[in-house]
Amino acid sequence: MSLALKPAVVLERSTPMSGAVELVVHHPPAAAALRPGQFFQLAVAAPQTILRRPYSAAWADPDSGRIGFIFNVVGAGSGWLAVRHEGHELDLLGPLGRGFDLDGSKPAIIVAGGLGVAVFPGVVGALVARGRQVTVLLGARTSAQLLPSGRFPGAEVMTATDDGTAGYQGSVVDLMPVALGRFPPPQGEGRGGGPEIFACGPTPMLQALLEKSRRLGVPLGLIQVSLETPMGCGVGTCLGCAIARPGDGYLLTCLDGPCVRADRIDWSRTADAFHG
């Protein structure tokens, strides 16, 4: 369900990890409507910006009407957002798109590379609230860029850093065999057996995750990914976020995603469309 919203009011601004900003805004209708993994189109007033910018919500609290956004400063739009503070208003459109499918009872493995972690605090909270066993795999270049494990209460957290300053030294994808080894293996193709995997991160990480999962016998149907594609309108009009699906045809990230099961995507034809 998408909403044309009156402005949200910024309540807090913080830096949860190096290079990232977290804005907490107040908008009760949006907080109540949001499903984990959905996104908003935020209007920015930076110079030379015309289109709204898509940002996945990190979490929402319907009781207090609060929504959190975690993002890196990479351009004019995010730079403008990064200097908003308490009392500023933000023009939001959303929530938009499809969030993660959190139904079921399988154990869940979260694979978050870099700022891909931004979508997962609310996802993990919802999974834990459903009684599902959750293991969070966090990866970053260095320890200062890791979201604190305390943001995932009720889940086991494992970390990997490129420089070895926290946890395993190497890619977060390298933690997959350890995490998967704690559960019965998947039962062939489809979605039977084994844990379910939820992932978001840079393109190389997603590609490595899919290859590692294939070698470990994990069907693509057990993997859900949150896609980061170039997006214009966010409502299915501009077709700028199309990604190829198996066979003929395309999915639109803004309508069919951003959260999609990996077996619905033709990765050989769409790898260049993603950026993280």
Regions flagged by a language model, labelled:
Residues 1-5, 183, 188-192, 272-276:
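Short, low-complexity, intrinsically disordered N-terminal peptides in bacterial proteins
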Residues 2-86:
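Ferredoxin-reductase
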Residues 12, 59, 159-161, 225, ...:
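Structural signal for conserved beta-strand scaffold positions within catalytic alpha/beta enzyme cores
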Residues 119, 203-204, 227-259:
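Local cysteine-cluster metal-coordination motifs and their immediate loop/turn environment
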Residues 255-276:
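Short Fe-S-cluster ligation motifs
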